[in-house]
């Protein structure tokens, strides 16, 4: 999209807070945006701060025929810089999220904002903070968010010293929906109508005041629908401040980052996160439409789980927790019920208390180790047994040892104090050249996810 802006040199009064009529904008190509080359405009025409963060929208209050003629016969000032965001996306494809964030804030200043949902996209705010540039953050308050999400909003504001710009749904539209269909109509006829009122329309209003926005979309969040996300693009759906298709640029700094790496970054930087993550929530939205996922499930399976039942039946029902025939709900009051052991592959080393203590003391190991802290009665441990045994068989003879340590009963206090045990199962990686184990941060415990994390830290 190309935006051609003609500015008269006769007076600076043509710059005001009113918007360009959409008819004054000439469309060329989606994928590129023509920005005014401010360095070629005289100071008499524009009064701009040297800081990009203070640059406001260039808008015309009134353009007379005389001023247009005058500008054409004197100095030509409609010099434009063509920004090809498709080409920029290619150049930034292998850039770090920090570099991409810095480029976005540098280019758009106060006309760009971070969209924050209250989940792991808090990483975007940390990256923006690390650039040292001013930045804006907005969030959609649907009125149906979890209390934990609202508390995170408050914590983030205090942690970074910012004010989140909240967008709310239209009260009349919400009232009509609830009165006509009730509070939970989405369980009956799908979530699209409710989301359109509570999320999409407020987002449109927010974006109409911007020229660019920053999202936390990642390719691995939904391989079927998000696998082609570029790090920057001209938004093909929403409109920006100047109006019209192509008037808004969308930045996705973490598009190429794996979820595990995002979490490692959050932990390393000690960033405040939503406490729902510790309860098994990965993708977090409105309270009625979000639930925790089970080990091995994809993170998006915790959202709108009642829809497209046939298409998602295998993934959903496979993770369902069934009543344990060993009676673990009543028999293991002290966490030491007599139930069959798990993780029984011949390639899984069974560590004793002394064995894992010795492993912790080693500073220069010959091999890396991946160890699961488990309780055999725990349904989440049982659910990951097959994938962990498969991992052990896959890594046999590879230079990585796979082990288990039963951490319930008398060993639980030790495991909490010395082994970072929070809940079962907890997975630790003991790198070759480090005595301190690294805790696996994700609820995704399939073979590929575990292998990917292991390769990053071993």
From Swiss-Prot:
It holds the Pfam family Thioredoxin. PROSITE patterns: THIOREDOXIN_2. Keywords: 4Fe-4S, Amino-acid biosynthesis, Chloroplast, Cysteine biosynthesis, Disulfide bond, Iron, Iron-sulfur, Metal-binding, Oxidoreductase, Plastid, Redox-active center, Stress response, Transit peptide. The active site is at 378 (nucleophile), 381 (nucleophile). It is an enzyme of class 1 (oxidoreductase). Residues 337-458 form the Thioredoxin domain. Reduces sulfate for Cys biosynthesis. Substrate preference is adenosine-5'-phosphosulfate (APS) >> 3'-phosphoadenosine-5'-phosphosulfate (PAPS). Uses glutathione or DTT as source of protons. The C-terminal domain may function as glutaredoxin and mediates the interaction of the enzyme with glutathione (GSH). Active in GSH-dependent reduction of hydroxyethyldisulfide, cystine, dehydroascorbate, insulin disulfides and ribonucleotide reductase. This is 5'-adenylylsulfate reductase 3, chloroplastic. It comes from Arabidopsis thaliana (Mouse-ear cress). The lineage of its organism: Eukaryota, Viridiplantae, Streptophyta, Embryophyta, Tracheophyta.
């Amino acid at each position: 999209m190309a935006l051609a802006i003609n500015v008269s040199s006769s007076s600076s009064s043509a710059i005001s807070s009113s918007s360009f009529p959409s008819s004054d904008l000439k469309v060329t190509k989606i994928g590129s945006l023509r920005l005014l080359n401010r360095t070629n405009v005289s100071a008499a025409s524009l009064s701009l701060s040297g800081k990009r963060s203070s640059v406001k929208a260039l808008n015309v209050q009134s353009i007379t025929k005389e001023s247009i003629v005058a500008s054409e016969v004197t100095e030509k000032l409609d010099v434009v810089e063509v920004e090809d965001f498709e080409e920029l996306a290619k150049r930034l494809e292998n850039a770090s999220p920090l570099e991409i964030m810095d480029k976005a804030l540098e280019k758009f200043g106060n006309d760009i904002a971070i969209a924050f949902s209250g989940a792991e996209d808090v990483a975007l705010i940390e990256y923006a903070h690390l650039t040292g540039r001013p930045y804006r953050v907005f969030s959609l308050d649907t009125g149906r968010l979890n209390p934990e999400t609202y508390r995170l909003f408050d914590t983030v504001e205090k942690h970074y010293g910012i004010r989140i710009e909240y967008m709310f749904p239209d009260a009349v539209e919400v009232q009509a929906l609830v009165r006509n269909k009730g509070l939970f109509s989405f369980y009956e006829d799908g979530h699209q109508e409710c989301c359109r009122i509570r999320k999409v329309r407020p987002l449109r209003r927010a974006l109409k005041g911007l020229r660019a926005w920053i999202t936390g979309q990642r390719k691995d969040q939904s391989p079927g629908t998000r696998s082609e996300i570029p790090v920057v693009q001209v938004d093909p759906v929403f409109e920006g401040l100047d109006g019209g298709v192509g008037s808004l640029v969308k930045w996705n700094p973490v598009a190429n980052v794996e979820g595990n790496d995002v979490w490692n970054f959050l932990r390393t930087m000690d960033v405040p996160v939503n406490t729902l993550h510790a309860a098994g929530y990965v993708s977090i939205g409105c309270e009625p439409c979000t639930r925790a996922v089970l080990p091995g499930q994809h993170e998006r399976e915790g959202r709108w789980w009642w829809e497209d039942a046939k298409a998602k039946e295998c993934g959903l029902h496979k993770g369902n927790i069934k009543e344990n025939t060993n009676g673990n709900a009543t028999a293991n009051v002290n966490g030491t019920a007599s139930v069959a052991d798990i993780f029984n592959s011949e390639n899984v080393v069974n560590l004793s208390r002394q064995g894992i203590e010795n492993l912790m003391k080693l500073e220069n190991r010959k091999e890396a180790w991946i160890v699961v802290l488990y309780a055999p009665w725990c349904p989440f441990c049982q659910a990951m047994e097959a994938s962990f045994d498969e991992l052990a068989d896959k890594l046999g003879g590879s230079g990585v040892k796979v082990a288990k340590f039963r951490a319930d009963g008398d060993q639980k206090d030790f495991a909490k104090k010395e082994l970072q045990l929070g809940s079962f199962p907890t997975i630790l990686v003991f790198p070759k050249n480090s005595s301190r184990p690294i805790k696996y941060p994700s609820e995704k415990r399939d073979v590929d996810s575990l292998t990917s994390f292991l390769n990053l830290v071993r």
